[in-house]
C-alpha cells in the first residue's frame, strides 16, 4: 500500500489534512477534513504543480495529463484532478471521503509532488455554461492548498 498526505493551509484561516491511500493498481482513496470554510460546496481538485511560492496561485491548472475538458468525477471527459465538491457544514468543516481511479500515487501519472486545492465556490462540474466551466468549473478563488507528499 502506498500512502501520501497533504497539509492544507492558507492566509485565510482555512486548514486541514488530506490523506491518500492506494492498494496496488487500485483506485486511490482520499480522506480527511478541512476547517474554516464557509458553509456549502467547495471545488476540490488536484492541481498540476506542487509549487506554493506564490500561495495557492502557483499550483497551476487542474492536473490534466490526458488533455481533457473539466468535468465531474464520474464523467469520462474530465481532468484527472477533478474531484468534484466537498461540503462544509454549518461549523465550516468539510469531511472528505472520495475514491478515484485517475489520481494514482505511483507510475507515470502519479499525483505525488502535486497540490490539492480547496476553492471558495462550488465546482459546476463543467456544466454551468460559464466561460470558465470547461476549464475550472468556475469554482472561484483558491482558499487552501497543500503539496501531496509520500508518507511512511
From Swiss-Prot:
Catalytic activity: 2 superoxide + 2 H(+) = H2O2 + O2
Gene Ontology CC terms, in alphabetical order: cytoplasm
A biological process from GO: removal of superoxide radicals
Compartments where located: Cytoplasm
UniProt cross-references to CDD domains, sorted A to Z: Cu-Zn_Superoxide_Dismutase
Documented EC number(s): 1.15.1.1
GO molecular function, one term: superoxide dismutase activity
Cofactors required: Cu cation; Zn(2+)
Coiled coil ranges: none
InterPro entries: SOD-like_Cu/Zn_dom_sf, SOD_Cu/Zn_/chaperone, SOD_Cu/Zn_BS, SOD_Cu_Zn_dom
Residues the record lists as binding Cu cation: 45, 47, 62, 119
Positions that bind Zn(2+): 62, 70, 79, 82
ATP-binding found in the keyword field: no
Keywords noted in UniProt: Antioxidant, Copper, Cytoplasm, Disulfide bond, Metal-binding, Oxidoreductase, Zinc
Disulfide bonds: 56-145
Cofactor annotation remark: Binds 1 copper ion per subunit. Binds 1 zinc ion per subunit.
Domain of life: Eukaryota
SUPFAM superfamilies, sorted: Cu,Zn superoxide dismutase-like
Function: Destroys radicals which are normally produced within the cells and which are toxic to biological systems.
Family statement: Belongs to the Cu-Zn superoxide dismutase family.
Subunit structure, interactors included: Homodimer.
PANTHER family, alphabetized: SUPEROXIDE DISMUTASE CU-ZN -RELATED
Protein name: Superoxide dismutase [Cu-Zn] 4A
Organism annotation: Zea mays
Lineage: Eukaryota, Viridiplantae, Streptophyta, Embryophyta, Tracheophyta
Amino acid at each position: 500500500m502506498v500512502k501520501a498526505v497533504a497539509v492544507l493551509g492558507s492566509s485565510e484561516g482555512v486548514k486541514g489534512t488530506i490523506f491518500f491511500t492506494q492498494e496496488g493498481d487500485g483506485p486511490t482513496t482520499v480522506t480527511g477534513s478541512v476547517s474554516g470554510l464557509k458553509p456549502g460546496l467547495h471545488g476540490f481538485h488536484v492541481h498540476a504543480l506542487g509549487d506554493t511560492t506564490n500561495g495557492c496561485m502557483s499550483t497551476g491548472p487542474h492536473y490534466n495529463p490526458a488533455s481533457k475538458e473539466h468535468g465531474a468525477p464520474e464523467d469520462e471527459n474530465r481532468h484527472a484532478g477533478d474531484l468534484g465538491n466537498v461540503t462544509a457544514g454549518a461549523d465550516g468543516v468539510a469531511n472528505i471521503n472520495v475514491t478515484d481511479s485517475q489520481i494514482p500515487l505511483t507510475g507515470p501519472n502519479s499525483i505525488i509532488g502535486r497540490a490539492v486545492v480547496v476553492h471558495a465556490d462550488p465546482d459546476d462540474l463543467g456544466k454551468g455554461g460559464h466561460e470558465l466551466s470547461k476549464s475550472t468549473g468556475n469554482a472561484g478563488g483558491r482558499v487552501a492548498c497543500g503539496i501531496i507528499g509520500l508518507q511512511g
